[in-house]
Amino acid sequence: MTSRWIFGLVFLVCAGLLAVAFYMEHVMGLEPCPLCWLQRFGFMGAGLVSLLAFLHGPRGFGNRVYGLLLIVAAGAGLAVAGRQLWLQSLPADQVPACGPSVDYMLEVLPWFEVLQTALKGTGDCAEVVWRFLGLSIPGWTAVFFSLLIVLGLFVMLRRYSPRDWLQS
């Protein structure tokens, strides 16, 4: 499988995961917390990088650059998912207080303060509202971000032959 098709697959996975997030929000009625929003941005970043790589069809060094960008986007998302998993593991008396919604913060606070508040997480972020096979939503996003990092590493570290370049 060429790197171009790997990036295409990553884009489709990211688009599918974002569709699931919007389904959970608008159909199931789950309100996303600030860390959930940041994880969505991680998937958007990884998806955008992958779409650009798929459309560009890079060779050699270009694959490594796109692979690195994919790793950076997925790594940031994994860090945010890890933060939320940590908040969910805290005892009830150590959970931070609930904060305002993201929409409200965007209306009244500067962007930098919204980002700082979102990265800290709130009590909303510590609440487990849904599970599948024993994992909460940030658990599943951590699994998918880890998979994206592995695919980014694969694209970066694999050896490229002229035959691969012709199939891009």
UniProtKB/Swiss-Prot annotation:
The keyword Phosphoprotein does not apply. It comes from the Bacteria. One of its GO terms (cellular component) is plasma membrane. SUPFAM superfamilies: DsbB-like (SSF158442). Its main location: membrane. The chain crosses the membrane at residues 7-23, 42-58, 66-82, 140-158. It is found in: Cell inner membrane. Pfam families: DsbB (PF02600). Residues 1-6, 59-65, 159-168 are cytoplasmic. Residues 24-41, 83-139 are periplasmic. The keyword Chaperone applies. GO terms for biological process: protein folding. Keywords: Cell inner membrane, Cell membrane, Chaperone, Disulfide bond, Electron transport, Membrane, Oxidoreductase, Redox-active center, Transmembrane, Transmembrane helix, Transport. GO terms for molecular function: electron transfer activity; protein-disulfide reductase activity. It is a multi-pass membrane protein. Disulfide bonds join 33-36, 98-125. Required for disulfide bond formation in some periplasmic proteins. Acts by oxidizing the DsbA protein. PANTHER family: DISULFIDE BOND FORMATION PROTEIN B. Belongs to the DsbB family. This is Disulfide bond formation protein B. It comes from Marinobacter nauticus (strain ATCC 700491 / DSM 11845 / VT8) (Marinobacter aquaeolei). The lineage of its organism: Bacteria, Pseudomonadati, Pseudomonadota, Gammaproteobacteria, Pseudomonadales.
